[in-house]
Amino acid sequence: MDFSMVAGAAAYNEKSGRITSLSLLFQKVFAQIFPQWRKGNTEECLPYKCSETGALGENYSWQIPINHNDFKILKNNERQLCEVLQNKFGCISTLVSPVQEGNSKSLQVFRKMLTPRIELSVWKDDLTTHAVDAVVNAANEDLLHGGGLALALVKAGGFEIQEESKQFVARYGKVSAGEIAVTGAGRLPCKQIIHAVGPRWMEWDKQGCTGKLQRAIVSILNYVIYKNTHIKTVAIPALSSGIFQFPLNLCTKTIVETIRVSLQGKPMMSNLKEIHLVSNEDPTVAAFKAASEFILGKSELGQETTPSFNAMVVNNLTLQIVQGHIEWQTADVIVNSVNPHDITVGPVAKSILQQAGVEMKSEFLATKAKQFQRSQLVLVTKGFNLFCKYIYHVLWHSEFPKPQILKHAMKECLEKCIEQNITSISFPALGTGNMEIKKETAAEILFDEVLTFAKDHVKHQLTVKFVIFPTDLEIYKAFSSEMAKRSKMLSLNNYSVPQSTREEKRENGLEARSPAINLMGFNVEEMYEAHAWIQRILSLQNHHIIENNHILYLGRKEHDILSQLQKTSSVSITEIISPGRTELEIEGARADLIEVVMNIEDMLCKVQEEMARKKERGLWRSLGQWTIQQQKTQDEMKENIIFLKCPVPPTQELLDQKKQFEKCGLQVLKVEKIDNEVLMAAFQRKKKMMEEKLHRQPVSHRLFQQVPYQFCNVVCRVGFQRMYSTPCDPKYGAGIYFTKNLKNLAEKAKKISAADKLIYVFEAEVLTGFFCQGHPLNIVPPPLSPGAIDGHDSVVDNVSSPETFVIFSGMQAIPQYLWTCTQEYVQSQDYSSGPMRPFAQHPWRGFASGSPVD
């Protein structure tokens, strides 16, 4: 059995088949317990590994397939998903979109000279193949390229990009938001990658987030202009607009404006000639283009160049989704959306009237006076100043249901195309504006009618465009999603679909169309725990229970959030408090249930972090090392209390201890020594006081406690707390429970953790001092005698032969070892030691206002 699988260089001798890496050896052991890890196929998880560099240890990255419905649910809650997986398990995650492939051709949609020497342009293209000297990567602080653009660059350019990034962090530390790091580009067509860290969006700190994004762009420009004068072209993505949740429109405007301010009107000696703003996603391309036009003015490209669009073909009908202005379209027919009593109401009607001219309004009113009936849904006029023959005005009558009007008006417009021999028609996103039809519902109705028309009128050749206003990105996403769904359905029924939508592309063993979760972590345990949690979340039906003692520490703000979640998501949330156990029971429809569960888990992670920080401040104060300056700068500090987890050499004592675990049915996978100088100093101070009180008698016991994985690191960081242990019956008092009987612990673990493959047991030195018989009403140790000032130090289950010890202060225990076990048998391996690996807490992003945990 290997006790040192925290870090190790990956190596494998293919000729002999011999594993020469400690980490691969550990992975082999895990493969015996979790057979799906060996498959490496798209049905389970697809692991790849990066070998160790410096002290950062190994990284694991798995791609977990999910279905399209689950992808939609998770995409709507991507921030919460990523935050929970990072804060709960230490894993970085991103969602792989099922509709990412798009058009593979590079397309320039905007171009403008910023200065006489430097041109800015907007491109729809894949940054992994975009031809420039330097590509900017949207990176995180740790430069762990586990998903999104970062992962795509590593896959295309080679793992040396990740290795070089790890070396950078090992040498210089994390990269703060607004800063950059530069590495080689591997096999990419560019010469360098500039890893820029953008801000994580906080609604309450809009100005601060915008400032950090501006600093990131300025850092990029300073590098390509002043530090590396060989760079002539640079490509920049929409930094922070992905999982960092920076609003897309604000993001692109900030980037373009920062570039303009940094370059225009400032003489400089530089070889830089071109700045490319690049994305392969249509909404981002449209946002970059709109921001550039708004800030820099009209594009200097020819008018014929437009962004690429989604398209599908059914029989003789071509259906397209484009981003643009409905009044600027060129087609036989442009469709208008009007109030029958006032043609000037509504954004679409106003835009069309302004472009078409007052003659159109006069004809509309005249035609309405002659032909109008209360049941009429479509009125036809000439196009006048628009680039069309006719305008079909859809009339929204207030007395009819809006979805019904949309359905019948759409059908009537298409039927008129046959009557008037129309070959092209452009629709706005009918119903999604003032009519307030949900964008998904409107898209479904419009697609239903178009596809029904295509099947019923096979011989009629018609091009239908849905024209989405450039800034209506959510509507564009809804329509694109509907097209992707319909394309898939139609391809199964042998309809004619363009080759670009049928192409089967594979990415890391998965089809590019297949939605998935990219998961990246430092070790196999955290990867397994995160994967197991994801599976539990996705297996929910209409009921779920969250068990977490931090529920007791929810403040008014959190309870207001719970109330709001009940209202907006149509779920019921019930708080259940019983001795030793606190739960939230959530019931509701599956999609709402998953959304609410992730929001609650995210909230509990933040409360847990706030509580841990309070414990840290208490530790510093107990040592007399807490200052006002520390308190002021705490939120700016990347680390507070640092601890080490290190592999343990195979001493005889640990070998004997391992045998005791195995006798109790717990197979040991790994043991790590915990080293926390701050926690140890506080513990030793307490121990010295107790030894003086007991006149040097033995004051401590070596005891054990099982802890859920999500609390293992926080125990190493701030010590044992009642809220971190597994639930137990507080029959000896409301304290922190330990046992010296491994057999009892193992039996309890098998009952409580029957579904968990891994069990985590801390071995601790516990200051038990004077102890007495415990009682359920104890909230502190009883006095040594009735009326005495001094009290006992702990309580036990049986004074004459104690097995269970209860303390009431976390400073009375120090974690020494963490044993990772499984309840299933695994083949034992040789002992080996390895290098130490530093751990620190994950950065906490705080509450929007104040602290509810008082």
Curated annotation (Swiss-Prot):
ADP-ribosylated by PARP14. It holds the Pfam family Macro. Changing G147E: Reduces the binding to poly(ADP-ribose) by 50 percent and prevents increase in DTX3L-mediated histone ubiquitination without affecting ubiquitin ADP ribosylation, interaction with DTX3L and STAT1 and DTX3L catalytic activity. Changing F738K: Severe reduction in ubiquitin ADP ribosylation. No effect on the interaction with DTX3L and on DTX3L E3 ligase activity. Increases DNA repair. The keyword Membrane does not apply. It is found in: Cytoplasm, Cytosol; Nucleus. Residues 628-850 form the PARP catalytic domain. It is an enzyme of class 2 (transferase). InterPro entries: Macro_dom, Macro_dom-like, Mono-ARTD/PARP, PARP14_KH_8, Poly(ADP-ribose)pol_cat_dom. GO terms for biological process: cell migration; defense response to virus; DNA damage checkpoint signaling; double-strand break repair; innate immune response; negative regulation of catalytic activity; negative regulation of gene expression; negative regulation of transcription by RNA polymerase II. GO terms for molecular function: ADP-D-ribose binding; enzyme binding; enzyme inhibitor activity; histone binding; NAD+ poly-ADP-ribosyltransferase activity; NAD+-protein-C-terminal glycine ADP-ribosyltransferase activity; nucleotidyltransferase activity; STAT family protein binding. Induction: Up-regulated by IFNG in macrophages and in B-cell lymphoma cell lines. Up-regulated by IFNB1 or viral infection. Down-regulated by IL4 in macrophages. Belongs to the ARTD/PARP family. Macro domains 1 and 2 may be involved in the binding to poly(ADP-ribose). Macro domain 2 is required for recruitment to DNA damage sites. Macro domains 1 and 2 are probably dispensable for the interaction with STAT1 and DTX3L and for STAT1 phosphorylation. This is Protein mono-ADP-ribosyltransferase PARP9. It comes from Homo sapiens (Human).
